[in-house]
Regions:
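Gly/Lys-enriched N-terminal cap/neck module of very large, oligomeric protein machines
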Residues: 4-7, 11-162
Length: 162
């Protein structure tokens, strides 16, 4: 579960931190208030592509920009962290994506609990963290295998794929 999202120097957000509590969270606001920026930031944090040329995507400002997400640990995440030799002392998972601008170049770094990781590792851990389904997208709300698991669990019988 996502417990906090921090943005620094990302489009409208000079410095902003959202804290999420257990339960259902709704993000509402007028057009242009930054809702899409929040979701795009979360996507980029978890391995999504950042396009600096598109006005629909995040635009980086200042010399340094940062997106940081804090997540509760579950057993799957703990196992992943153990397999990748990443410490998890406090029961939380902290993912950080940082951009620095030097000599007309953009240097990006991603970290999990302070350890530098690559995009492949971020994409590997993404399904264990969050599943965002946006308006008009219904192709992957629940995978077929998971649907069958719940049906089997409700009926006490195994349903086979045809």
């Amino acid at each position: 579960m996502l417990t906090a999202l921090k943005l620094k120097n990302i489009v409208l957000f000079e410095s902003n931190e959202l804290v999420f509590k257990k339960g259902f969270t709704t993000i509402t606001g007028e057009s242009g208030s930054g809702k899409s920026i929040l979701f795009k930031s979360l996507d980029v944090l978890l391995g999504g592509q950042l396009s600096l040329s598109s006005s629909k995507n995040i635009q980086i400002g200042n010399d340094k920009s940062l997106i940081e997400g804090t997540f509760c640990l579950n057993n799957s995440l703990k196992n992943w962290l153990i397999d990748h030799e990443i410490d998890f002392d406090n029961g939380e998972l902290l993912i950080t994506k940082e951009w620095r601008f030097r000599e007309n170049k953009i240097i990006t770094r991603s970290r999990i609990n302070g350890v530098m990781v690559n995009r492949k590792q971020i994409l590997e851990i993404r399904p264990l963290l969050i599943d965002v389904t946006s308006q008009g997208v219904s192709n992957k709300i629940i995978p077929t295998e998971e649907k069958l698991f719940y049906i089997d669990k409700l009926t006490d019988k195994t349903i086979e794929n045809l």
